[in-house]
């Protein structure tokens, strides 16, 4: 049997190398040079998602020397978070997307995915959390702005609070300490929202506040709706904060779900969810620096210049121009959160990025469902990822939570949004 042969090979490799075969095999799918298997295509992809179960009195698992607490509960699908200059935390809550199904397999996939999501209605709001005395207990949980349209990305600069709805980038005037918006938002720029196969709009802002960067996902897996449906999609927009004028900053990014600016260098980075239906171990979701004018492959190629022969017509010139991402995260982990760390997280976790992995729906053995730390050295990813927040899945295969946004709080914490349990977690170094 193929499985027996594979297990024998792994066992022999473990004996020869002195490390566990399972760990060695997993490590091959991470980093700058992942092992890519041959594509596997079938009538239906593998589909499996864990049944939700409450946290009860349990908590996520964090590394030794850290502790975790829930600082907000009973939310309505928390996605991304933002720490304001005064320490207040904003939480974007909502669920978007309304793409019609093209094939029966799309209907089946939606049913499978729905089993792993909350039954709570979309909040379509931004909630504010406040810990006034700095004791780690957030005694105030109040709605800052409501009647939004599936808000996702959040950014702040010099009294301007930006929210990326699924259809528009908007701005609120903000004064230090206010607990609710004083007026309706001003639209900065309209964002693509027709069909909205991938609806999330990731957001970050340049250090000088001049430009906003918005991640806009594709309208399909691999152009099943035609290239016209992909106009202005599968890319990062650069938007002038004052005028709202935009331009494509980088293209060929199937679904850039979180963006962050690297401290010091000002370099834009992203996590990207790659295409489906090429097998359980293709294609790796990834972390990458985003180069202005760069093309990252979608839909014609993946992980550099590996051709996706499902796409018609082919474009060899585009394939040749495809940039290889910096760091593979593993296939189908569904990375949705990204933030750079700092010294407040301790020496071991001071240099690198935290990534929230929402978890797979299209593998027999689920992956993701955790927050990882990717260490950096000299400004680049270096080494294997480290599990930082786990325990979202139970030993019997059920799911307590699904991490989305991750934000480093300068006061010394990692903030994690959990959109299944409708909780915001706070991870701190033990005192």
Residue ranges of predicted features:
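Hydrophobic core register within WD40 beta-propeller blades
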Residues: 81, 154, 203, 256-259, ...
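Blade-level signature of beta-propeller repeat domains, shared across WD40, Kelch, NHL, RCC1
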Residues: 407-431
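Asp-box/WD-like beta-propeller blade repeats and closely related beta-sheet repeat scaffolds
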Residues: 137-160, 165-206
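C-terminal motif of bacterial Sec signal peptides marking the signal peptidase cleavage site
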Residues: 15-18
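Surface loop/turn motifs at the tips and blade-to-blade linkers of beta-strand repeat domains
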Residues: 71-74, 142-148, 188-195, 248-252, ...
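Conserved beta-propeller blade signature
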Residues: 88-90, 160-163, 211-215, 267-271, ...
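Beta-propeller domain segments
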Residues: 21-62, 98-102, 108-109, 115-116, ...
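Residue-level detector of Asp-centered blade-edge/turn motifs that repeat once per structural unit
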Residues: 84-87, 156-158, 205-209, 262-265, ...
């Amino acid at each position: 049997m193929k499985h027996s042969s594979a297990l024998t090979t792994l066992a022999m490799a473990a004996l020869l190398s002195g490390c566990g075969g399972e760990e060695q095999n997993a490590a091959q799918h991470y980093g700058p040079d992942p092992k890519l298997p041959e594509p596997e295509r079938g009538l239906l992809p593998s589909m499996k998602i864990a049944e939700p179960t409450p946290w009860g009195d349990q908590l996520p698992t964090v590394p030794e020397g850290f502790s975790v607490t829930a600082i907000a509960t009973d939310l309505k699908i928390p996605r991304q978070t933002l720490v304001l200059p005064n320490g207040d935390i904003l939480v974007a809550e909502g669920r978007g997307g309304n793409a019609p199904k093209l094939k029966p397999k799309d209907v089946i996939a939606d049913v499978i995915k729905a089993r792993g999501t909350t039954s709570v209605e979309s909040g379509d709001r931004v909630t504010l959390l406040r810990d006034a005395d700095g004791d780690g207990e957030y005694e105030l949980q109040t709605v800052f702005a409501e009647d939004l349209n599936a808000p996702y990305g959040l950014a702040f600069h010099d009294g301007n609070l930006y929210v990326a709805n699924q259809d528009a980038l908007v701005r609120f005037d903000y004064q230090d300490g206010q607990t609710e918006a004083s007026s309706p938002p001003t639209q900065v720029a309209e964002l693509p929202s027709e069909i909205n196969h991938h609806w999330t709009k990731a957001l970050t802002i340049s250090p000088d506040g001049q430009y906003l960067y918005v991640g806009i996902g594709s309208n399909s897996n691999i152009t099943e709706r035609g290239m016209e449906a992909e106009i202005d999609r599968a890319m990062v927009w650069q938007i002038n904060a004052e005028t709202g004028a935009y331009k494509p900053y980088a293209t060929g990014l199937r679904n850039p779900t979180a963006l962050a600016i690297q401290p010091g260098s000002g370099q834009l980075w992203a996590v990207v969810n790659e295409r489906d239906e090429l097998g359980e171990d293709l294609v790796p979701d990834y972390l990458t620096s985003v180069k202005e004018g760069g093309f990252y492959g979608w839909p014609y190629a993946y992980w550099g210049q590996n051709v996706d022969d499902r796409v018609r017509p082919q474009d060899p010139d585009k394939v040749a121009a495809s940039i290889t991402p910096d760091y593979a995260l593993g296939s189908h982990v569904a990375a949705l959160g990204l933030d750079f760390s700092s010294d407040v997280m301790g020496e071991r976790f001071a240099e690198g990025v935290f990534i929230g992995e929402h978890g797979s729906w299209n593998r027999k053995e689920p992956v993701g469902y955790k927050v990882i730390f990717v260490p950096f050295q000299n400004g680049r990813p270096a080494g294997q990822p480290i599990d930082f927040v786990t325990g979202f899945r139970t030993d019997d295969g059920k799911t307590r939570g699904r991490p989305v946004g991750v934000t480093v709080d300068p006061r010394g914490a990692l903030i994690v949004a959990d959109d299944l349990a409708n909780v915001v977690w706070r991870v701190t170094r033990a005192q």
